[in-house]
Amino acid sequence: MKAPVLFSILLISFLSICRGENQAKHLFILSGQSNMQGHRPDEAFTPTVGKAFGKDNVIVLQDALGGQPIHRWWKKWRDPQGKKPEESGDLYDRLLSKVKLAIDGQKIASISFVWMQGERDAKMKWGVLYEKALVGLHTQLAEDLNWKVSDLAFVIGRLSDFDLKNKKYPHWSMVREAQVRVAKSTPKFAWVNTDDLNDGKNRKGREIKNDLHYSAEGYQILGQRFAEACIQQI
């Protein structure tokens, strides 16, 4: 093979590699409480967004903790008496530190924030505060990532049909409604239905019906729905 031809092939290969390394990534941030903690991105979410954009072009980061109210993420949250809780924004700081580490040195094409939470706030009767908190959390994340608020996609997992009569969690319906209102407030927001995900066998093999948490299959479907909703926003 002549030297000029060989050089051209090597140059094209090198440029292709460089383009791959410099390709802007699609960032997906997943957070919330137990039903997000039970979700495993590798089962459905990551493969789905990877298929849509290329597995090397996506960054998926999940950080969640069960049983936690939204004020562990949104720092401006105040209780009905106007008091700041002792634990305020600490889980958000943990999440943000992981996000910044994951995107260090990367070019970002889009950011999608996926949120599955609200059970604790419904139980604590903080439903009246939830809509403001959701919007505030989204804005807080956009600002901390230096991203335009209107360009940050927001996908919300609506609370399931676990306690529609509000017996165990007095503000269950209130939080559900707040989630939908926020999701419908701007084109970059969306909500995902979970009403059919809490029947069947859980991850321990126990049969569940209309449970607080989802079945093993339900978590896989949840990941698929989250991914599809994100893809539609990008």
Where are these regions (language model features)?
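Sec-dependent N-terminal signal peptides
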Residues: 4-14
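Mature, extracytoplasmic segments of signal peptide-bearing proteins
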Residues: 16-18
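Cell-envelope and extracellular/periplasmic
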Residues: 20-234
